Amino acid sequence: MKIRASVRKICEKCRLIRRRRRIMIICLNPKHKQRQG
């Protein structure tokens, strides 16, 4: 999980979701997991 100021989709499989007022990226590739800090 990478915590970043700006999150964006890295590949086509990345999905942008909102969880507890946080924007997160979930993907089939575990390296692409991100969360907005």
Curated annotation (Swiss-Prot):
Q: Name one Pfam family in it.
A: Ribosomal_L36
Q: Which GO terms describe its cellular component?
A: chloroplast; ribonucleoprotein complex; ribosome
Keywords of the record, alphabetical order, are: Chloroplast, Plastid, Ribonucleoprotein, Ribosomal protein
Keyword Phosphoprotein assigned: no
Keyword check for Signal: no
Q: Record's PROSITE patterns? A: RIBOSOMAL_L36
Q: Where in the cell is it found?
A: Plastid, Chloroplast
Q: Which domain of life is it from?
A: Eukaryota
- What molecular function terms (GO) are annotated for this protein? structural constituent of ribosome
> Which residues lie in coiled coils?
none
Question: Which family does the entry's similarity section mention?
Answer: Belongs to the bacterial ribosomal protein bL36 family.
Q: PANTHER family in the record, alphabetically?
A: 50S RIBOSOMAL PROTEIN L36, CHLOROPLASTIC, LARGE RIBOSOMAL SUBUNIT PROTEIN BL36C
Tell me the HAMAP family matching this sequence.
Ribosomal_bL36
- The protein here is known as Large ribosomal subunit protein bL36c
